[in-house]
Every structure is written in structure tokens, then in C-alpha cells.
């Protein structure tokens, strides 16, 4: 067992999933690539992806279903499973428990039952965030007792289950990766949202003083880290140091929070000569007011105290462990990643 013979990517039809397909497609020797998802693969791929869809085997199913999961693993004959399926932020807390906790429990159980050797789990850098500043955090930072939100709470629970499932005596090795601020082609939230802000004429507003450093990570780099983790777990010489461990994954270039937004806006020709700064305490009060008004009107609030805290917090991480043990180096820089994302958006897919 020294190479990836067959990989099953759970959540492979999603944003990160497409980048995972690309990274596994590009390695040599190329493994059999299988996708398990409740959604079909996109009918039309962006030019940013070069893999051949005909080479990808698709399995439709529910990751909380033991039968669906077992059938997909057995049919794929996967010796590596990558679990990146997760609902997006801002949804009902119940869906996070169903997918992130119950779904992950089922994935672990079926991997063990079917004799899978490697499980790589996509966690989140947000599992250590509770609204307080995060300065150069490494993997020794504790999970907070009071989580920031249901998404990160359930991600932390799932991560813990995956790490505790690591069992070298049964030839089952696990690892959890914690990417921060993912963006790239296929992103339906971050960059598209920033573009919409500019179109609405709101790019002149800034929440916070913009002195807070923040980690953004290109999706292709995150996918690359998953491939490296799988390879290290398959190698008898490196698996002991990697199995049962967590790793922060970033672009290793913390930037001031609003720098990415302004890079996007600049690329689109939106350059504001004057910026209106809304200080953090004022913005939090405005967030509470927005929530109250939106609740009265039965609408989703645009500004919330939660969003203000995220925008104003320091959140950057130390990836020395990933560099040393995984051999991870971000290959696509922030500006190049933004350009790739904008090019994808301009395709209108």
C-alpha cells in the first residue's frame, strides 16, 4: 500500500470537491477517481478545470445512509476516502448536525466496515474561533468551550470523531485539515458577494479599522494539501507522524482583511477615492438593530453582530506543521487566485 489506487471524494460535486478532482487527476500515477454526492457534477465545467469528466465515476447518494455509503465505497474499491461534504454557512443549525456530525459518523463507520485504509477530513480553521482574536495560531490552540456558531461547533465535533477513529492496529489512518477562508473558481459566496457589493455601490463602506490580519486560501492549494495528506498516510515512512493529526492550511500570506475585497474591486475597475469607516462598536450596535428590524419584517439581515466580529477579528494561522510533515507549500498566490476566480465568474457558469 504505497500509492492511491482509487479515491472516493465525498462532496465531490461542490466547490472544493471540483478542485479535489483536479488535484487527484493531475498526480502521477493517476488514481481512479470516484465522486459521492447528493448533487450531480456540473453539466458544464469552467475552463479553470482541465480534468476529463468522462474519467470520473459518479455515485449519487446520501452520506447519512449506511447503504448508500457502503455501496459507493465497495463499488469504488477506494483505498482513500476524502470527506469534504458540508453545508454552507448561514443555514439552519439542524442541517449542520445532520451532515457534519451524523454524516461523518456514518462515513467513519462505513470506511471501517469496508476496509478503507485512509480517511482525509476537511475541517475548518474556524473550529478554534469564538469571536476573539486569533494570532498566528498553531494546532496546539484549544477548541473553545463556547463555539462561534453551529457550523464550526459541528465541524469541531466531526473533526474529533475522525481523529479518535485513527487506528493503526486496524490499518486505518485518519487526518483532519483546517483550511481558512477558502476562495477560488466555483466559490458561490466570497468573491461573488464582494462583486455584488461593488455593483450596489457599497464598496466605499468599511467595517473596522482594517488593521486585522486575516488568512485567505486558494481552493486549489487546499485540494493540494488533501492529496499530500493522503500520500503521507499511505507511506509507511511518514504515516506515523501524520495520522491522527490536524493541520492548518492557508496561503501563508496573512493580509489585512479588506485587502482581498479591494483587490477584487480593483480588478473590476471599482476604486473608491474616499472610504467611510464604521468602527467596530458602532457596527455591532448597527448589527443588532439590523437583526431586530429584519426579524420584524421577516427578512434575512444584511448586517449582524456575528459578521462584524468576523470582519474585525485577527484570524491568521501558523502552517509550519503542514509544511514540515505534509510538505505543503501554497502554489497559487492570492492575486493569481483572485484572477482565476474572476475569470471563472466571467464565464457565467
From Swiss-Prot:
It is a peripheral membrane protein. This is Sterol-4-alpha-carboxylate 3-dehydrogenase ERG26, decarboxylating. NADP(+) binds at residues 11-17, 62-63, 84-86, 151, 155, 179-182. Heterotetramer of ERG25, ERG26, ERG27 and ERG28. ERG28 acts as a scaffold to tether ERG27 and other 4,4-demethylation-related enzymes, forming a demethylation enzyme complex, in the endoplasmic reticulum. It is found in: Endoplasmic reticulum membrane. It holds the Pfam family 3Beta_HSD. Disulfide bonds: none annotated. It comes from the Eukaryota. The active site is at residue 155. Inhibited by FR171456, a natural product with broad antifungal activity. One of its GO terms (cellular component) is endoplasmic reticulum. It is an enzyme of class 1 (oxidoreductase). Keywords: Endoplasmic reticulum, Lipid biosynthesis, Lipid metabolism, Membrane, NAD, NADP, Oxidoreductase, Steroid biosynthesis, Steroid metabolism, Sterol biosynthesis, Sterol metabolism. One of its GO terms (molecular function) is 3-beta-hydroxysteroid dehydrogenase [NAD(P)+]/C4-decarboxylase activity. Sterol-4-alpha-carboxylate 3-dehydrogenase; part of the third module of ergosterol biosynthesis pathway that includes the late steps of the pathway. The third module or late pathway involves the ergosterol synthesis itself through consecutive reactions that mainly occur in the endoplasmic reticulum (ER) membrane. It catalyses: 4beta-methylzymosterol-4alpha-carboxylate + NADP(+) = 3-dehydro-4-methylzymosterol + CO2 + NADPH. Belongs to the 3-beta-HSD family. Present with 2580 molecules/cell in log phase SD medium. Substrate binds at residues 124, 151. Pathway: Steroid biosynthesis; zymosterol biosynthesis; zymosterol from lanosterol: step 4/6. InterPro entries: 3Beta_OHSteriod_DH/Estase, Lipid_A_modif_metabolic_enz, NAD(P)-bd_dom_sf. It comes from Saccharomyces cerevisiae (strain ATCC 204508 / S288c) (Baker's yeast). The lineage of its organism: Eukaryota, Fungi, Dikarya, Ascomycota, Saccharomycotina. Its EC number is 1.1.1.170. The keyword NADP applies. One of its GO terms (biological process) is ergosterol biosynthetic process. The keyword Cytoplasm does not apply. The gene is ERG26.
